[in-house]
């Protein structure tokens, strides 16, 4: 039978690392959400200005 090894960390350093990585992760998520919103706003602007051209570009010809 295979033996399992258990590694146990001691001290509170892990909690500090976890808290800082969680804060950094939250900051990154907020930045990505902001960038995504900006991109979607830009797409909306293009569609408002050129909706007809946009649709024509994606209409398949020949009934395909």
Curated annotation (Swiss-Prot):
Residues 24-52 form a coiled coil. Residues 1-11 have a biased composition (Basic and acidic residues). Keywords: Coiled coil, Isopeptide bond, Ubl conjugation pathway. The keyword Coiled coil applies. Pfam families: Pup. There is a cross-link at residue 64 (Isoglutamyl lysine isopeptide (Gln-Lys) (interchain with K-? in acceptor proteins)). GO terms for molecular function: proteasome binding; protein tag activity. Residues 21-58 are annotated as: ARC ATPase binding. InterPro entries: Ubiquitin-like_Pup (IPR008515). Residues 1-37 are annotated as: Disordered. Pathway: Protein degradation; proteasomal Pup-dependent pathway. Is modified by deamidation of its C-terminal glutamine to glutamate by the deamidase Dop, a prerequisite to the subsequent pupylation process. The modification Deamidated glutamine is found at residue 64. The keyword S-adenosyl-L-methionine does not apply. One of its GO terms (biological process) is proteasomal protein catabolic process. Strongly interacts with the proteasome-associated ATPase ARC through a hydrophobic interface; the interacting region of Pup lies in its C-terminal half. There is one Pup binding site per ARC hexamer ring. Protein modifier that is covalently attached to lysine residues of substrate proteins, thereby targeting them for proteasomal degradation. The tagging system is termed pupylation. The N-terminal unstructured half of Pup provides a signal required to initiate unfolding and degradation by the proteasome but is not needed for pupylation, while the C-terminal helical half of Pup interacts with ARC to target proteins to the proteasome. HAMAP family: Pup. Belongs to the prokaryotic ubiquitin-like protein family. This is Prokaryotic ubiquitin-like protein Pup. It comes from Mycolicibacterium paratuberculosis (strain ATCC BAA-968 / K-10) (Mycobacterium paratuberculosis). The lineage of its organism: Bacteria, Bacillati, Actinomycetota, Actinomycetes, Mycobacteriales.
């Amino acid at each position: 039978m295979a033996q399992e090894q258990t590694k146990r960390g001691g001290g509170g350093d892990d909690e500090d690392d976890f808290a800082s990585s969680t804060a950094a992760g939250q900051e990154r998520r907020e930045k990505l959400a902001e960038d995504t919103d900006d991109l979607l706003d830009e797409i909306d602007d293009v569609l408002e200005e050129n909706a007809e051209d946009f649709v024509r570009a994606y209409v398949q010809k020949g009934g395909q």
